[in-house]
Amino acid sequence: MSERFPLYTTNYIGGVMSLRKPQIASLKILEEIVTSVNLRKGMNLRAALGSVHAMYPTCSDFEREFMSITFVLATGVGKTRLMGAFIAYLYTQHNIKNFFVVAPNTTIYNKLKRDLSDNNNPKYVFRGLGCFPVLPQIIADDDYRDKAISLYDSEIHIFIYNIDKFNKEGANMRKVNELLGDSFYQYLSNLPDLVLIMDESHHYRAEKGAQALNDLHPLLGLELTATPLVTAGTKQVPFKNVVYEYPLSKAIEDGYTRTPFAVTRSDIDFYNFGDEQLDKMMLLDGIACHERTKGELEVYATNHSTPEKPVRTVKPFMLVVCKDTDHAAWVENFIKSDEFRNGAYRNKTITVHSRQKGAETEANTRLLLDVENPSNPVEIVIHVNMLKEGWDVNNLYTIVPLRTAASKILREQMVGRGLRLPYGERTGDRDVDAVMLTAHDKFQDILAEAQKGDSIFKAGNVIKAEDLDEPEEITYTQL
């Protein structure tokens, strides 16, 4: 127990921060590991691994040149809040004051910076904690060039960097800085208590990124991801340093996300369907789901609003996932044609992919970032691959994967983009608490996975698309 912060046990931190069960479990595992291992710079990694492996056999290798452990948490459970809990615990109980948070892309970097630094932000992770008389000092971007870090008032320094910028700026970061009296890299690597926190850590397994992090010589690495897999050629290799796993199926079962539903048809045999014919049917069935959901969300908000406590109306959108840019162009042309709902979505559809340039990219990206806004006209987003990690949208209700949902992992990743709860918790209304995945051509695969018991659809339902035109006849069939 810390003499300075005796109150700050894992239970106390969990209560003040309103942590969920998997977050508290992760925090307690960190406590057990850190108190069991002689945590210090230059420690015997083999002995440390032996201790951790004895407690958590799934951890058989740190996989880095420093002690690093992975916590696998499903999308939407709250990885950023858990980071805040890790920082609060390590500071109050182990006097650790330097944290380096790594983001995989600009979107997540901006989100982390906002959630860790802006105490006016509703998602500020340290809200309620009284252990920081002066807010933790955030060092990001080019702060290392023009600020004297040692002069900051706060005891705690949180460095936040996008891995791409960190890799590209490597040469500059290794140059001597007059304010530091050393290079930024050397300054960091000389810190006796630097803890590395890696968000979406499956992105930092490539040789260049991994070595850049190894060169920081941190005391400890804490990895957070929902996808503990590394692609090696044609194979996906599981992480070897996992100490805790909370899968998507468990998050759904525990009510921390919306419930996925598979949409299919029982009145048509798809065996002789061509690709375009099947695409058109899935798009039309998808938009029927979208329109029905839009109506149900409006009804829910109206029925549950009072003058004292109005309930906002959630504006849903539909995501169409295409196999490549040519396919996306064909889909966009079809959706904007009179053949698709008489052209009703002509001005409510955007396409986002890497080949777009200039003004088109900026305009569509702006609309995508703002897709939760009720005044945003977009109701259909056409995307190659899928919405990237970091798009924390809570109004994606219908997902139409065209020629792309070939594997269980891909289906889970797609559905994962639409699991966040728009009201922060389940409402008890089946339609408000659902996300739809059209699965006409993969329904038998989904059914087989469900029967094995390891699918995100195992406790879910099937919606028969042929019933969508008659809402009162919609059947929710247990898988």
Outline where the language-model segments fall.
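Conserved SAM-binding loop
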Residues: 19, 101, 320
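Pre-Walker A (Motif I) flank of P-loop NTPase domains
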Residues: 59-60, 64-70, 97, 315-318, ...
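Conserved pre-motif I regulatory segment
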Residues: 2-72
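Helicase-associated low-complexity regulatory tails and linkers flanking the ATPase motor
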Residues: 28, 93-96, 110, 120-137, ...
